[in-house]
A protein has these predicted regions:
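Short beta-strand "acidic-cap" motif of Rossmann-like dinucleotide-binding folds
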Residues: 31-37, 228
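Glycine- and aromatic-enriched mobile tails/lids
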Residues: 1, 6-8, 17, 22-25, ...
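Conserved redox-cofactor binding core of oxidoreductases
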Residues: 99-182, 187, 194, 238-241, ...
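Short beta-strand to alpha-helix junction loop
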Residues: 81-94, 127-145, 155, 205-213, ...
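Glycine-/small-residue-rich beta->alpha transition segments that form the dinucleotide
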Residues: 188-190, 194-199, 372-373
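Core beta-strand elements of the Rossmann-like FAD/NAD(P) dinucleotide-binding domain
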Residues: 5-8, 180-190, 362
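An anion/pyrophosphate-binding glycine-rich loop and adjacent beta-alpha core
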Residues: 41, 218, 224-334, 338, ...
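Glycine-rich active-site loop/strand segments that organize a redox cofactor
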Residues: 55-89
Length: 573
């Protein structure tokens, strides 16, 4: 078959905060950078990040520094973060937010003109920089404009299907132009995978429609290693009603500004679960507390709890929480006068492509940045660390990808692999009968929410793993579409996305089944305590034939050598 080949030095897959920052950095290093995204450019999930960006600037609390940021991140991550990556994050986050200001981002200020910082969950000091409650939107708009200023070529509405690997090194990616249905090959000397998360594998989620786990699946099939995939964050506060809004994010900034959680009995229940941090305990702790209140009959009739800011000054709410004010006004709730109803919602993948400090994976020439990578956040991500992650490791990935591109020749494309992938992609269109993907997608979301959610058990995880493996091996090859059109065929793209969702969900379920303890966001009702003797480890996933191989690896530590260490006992060198 014939196909179009597009050449670049550095190819970035994904156009969110991490991907665009990587492309900007590569272009600044004078290489030809290109971006491929399945959405319209500028419409990435990053714009939905509302609360803020963590950086130890000490503008509000003068005692803050990178060491406290490091400590809070590792404690918040249930001690299994890759500490080499955490050190990079906390030391470079301040410089990267200054980059954003230079690009044009407008951040809230203190009365003396410095970047303002607010409290966020499980943090010792106020270090979350913000732009009202629209921080991600502000940052993304700035990054998009900088990308355009540098004249970086962007291929939007192009769906990446498989990474191309030649003799152990990256060679590019195969893709479909959604607008035309044409099969394309993007060849590159280096590739940055920045394709975002997989929240859409869950029935209730904050995530955009595009967050279907494409990057996790592509990485696995290419032979890359993934880490911490059992660690899925459920944000404590998503909207409960109306049904069309269920799961939409209610930013942690609401609690950071003083919002209070209470149950149907008007009890401030976080006193029972986290008496010191209360509403600003870790997201894993608050999500489990809310879920337990509902399960034990102390929730609202709609299945949530109340989040109240009506005790705060109306002017403060209008200034610092304008998006939340508008979001709830649309459903008839004035948060200045009455409480919101909230419940947990699928939010963030802590696990993903295993990278080192240079953002390199185990595949030569494949770099990673943003939510598709793992190791930085460990067992639970702190609110505000995600945006910092996108900028710190987006820059590192773009910079190191450019350095590689400057010293290697253009790779060879395996024509047999490309033609085989084209047959797989178009095969679904050519099939005359089989299984419709949309019913399987509904079943997948319900399965993951019910059996691989906030509370997990061995029996349910085994059932989920078995079902997902069966779907992957027996159902995927039988997908049948009603529409045979190649141009803007949403059913076709959803079928291809569903393949990625199923393999990603299977990885999550199998890693969760293997980890026989509770740690961070991973809670096993049959193993409700942490087990540092046996499970102070990371779980690494790699494809083995038609199966998924899992193994334990020691946690990479630098300053904090064992769980439970106090800040004062850490030897900061």
């Amino acid at each position: 078959m014939s196909y179009e080949v597009v050449d670049s030095d550095v190819l970035v897959i994904g156009a969110g905060g991490a991907g665009v920052r990587a492309a900007i950095e590569a272009a600044r290093k004078n290489v030809q950078a290109a971006v491929v995204t399945k959405e319209l450019f500028g419409k990435a999930h990053t714009i939905m990040a509302e609360g803020g960006y963590n950086a130890a600037l000490a503008n509000v609390d003068s005692s803050d520094n990178w060491m406290w940021h490091f400590y809070d991140t590792v404690v918040g991550g249930a001690w299994i973060n890759n500490q080499e990556l955490v050190e990079v994050l906390v030391k470079e986050a301040p410089d990267r937010i200054y980059d954003l200001e230079e690009f044009g981002s407008l951040l809230d200020r203190t009365t003396d003109g410095r970047i303002a910082q607010r409290a966020f969950g499980k943090q010792t000091y106020r270090r979350t920089c913000y732009s009202g409650d629209r921080t991600g939107h502000e940052l993304m708009a700035t990054l998009v404009e900088e990308c355009r200023r540098l004249d970086i070529e962007v291929f939007d509405e192009v769906f990446s299907t498989r990474l191309i690997v030649d003799d152990g090194r990256i060679a590019g990616v195969t893709a479909i132009d959604i607008k035309t249905g044409v099969f394309k090959v993007f060849r590159a000397k280096a590739v940055v995978l920045a394709s975002g998360g997989a929240g859409r594998i869950y029935e209730i989620t904050t995530n955009a429609q595009a967050d279907t786990g494409d990057g996790f699946a592509m990485a696995l099939y290419a032979g890359a290693e993934l880490v911490d995939m059992e660690m899925v964050q459920f944000h404590p506060t998503g909207m409960v009603y109306p049904e069309s809004c269920k799961g939409i994010l209610v930013t942690e900034a609401v609690r950071g500004e003083g919002g209070i959680l209470y149950n149907i009995h008007r009890e401030r229940f976080m006193k029972r679960y986290a008496p010191e941090k209360m509403e600003l305990a870790g997201r894993d702790e608050v999500a489990r507390a809310i879920a337990r209140e509902v399960l034990e009959g102390r929730g609202t009739p709609r299945g949530g709890v109340y989040l109240d800011v009506s005790h705060l000054a109306a002017e403060l709410i209008e200034e610092r929480l304008p998006s939340m004010l508008e979001q709830f006004e649309k459903v008839g709730v004035d948060i200045r006068k009455e409480p919101m109803e909230v419940a947990p919602t699928g939010h963030h993948m802590m696990g993903g492509l295993e990278i080192n400090e240079k953002a390199e994976s185990n595949i030569v020439g494949l770099f990673g940045a943003g939510e598709v990578t793992g190791g930085i956040h460990g067992g639970n991500r702190l609110g505000g660390n995600a945006l910092a992650d996108t900028q710190v490791f987006g820059k590192r990935a773009g910079e190191n990808a450019a350095l590689r591109a400057n010293r290697v020749s253009r790779p060879r494309i395996d024509r047999d692999f490309v033609e085989s992938e084209a047959e797989r992609v178009y095969g679904t269109l050519d099939r005359d009968d089989g299984v419709g993907p949309r019913e399987i997608m509904r079943n997948l979301k319900q399965l993951m929410w019910g059996k691989v959610g906030i509370f997990r058990s061995g029996a349910e995880l085994r059932e989920a793993s078995s079902t997902l493996t069966k779907w992957r091996l027996q159902v995927l090859p039988r997908f049948h579409l009603k529409s045979k059109c190649r141009r803007y065929n949403r059913e076709w793209i959803e079928a291809l996305e569903l393949e990625n969702m199923i393999i990603t969900a299977e990885i999550v379920a199998k890693a969760a089944l293997l980890r026989q303890e509770s740690r961070g966001a991973h809670f096993r009702v049959d193993f409700p305590k942490p087990d540092n003797e046996n499970w102070f480890v990371n779980i690494v996933v790699k494809k083995q034939g038609d199966d998924i191989g899992l193994r334990k690896e020691p946690v990479i530590t630098t300053y904090i050598k064992f769980p439970g260490a106090s800040f004062k006992k850490v030897k900061w060198q």
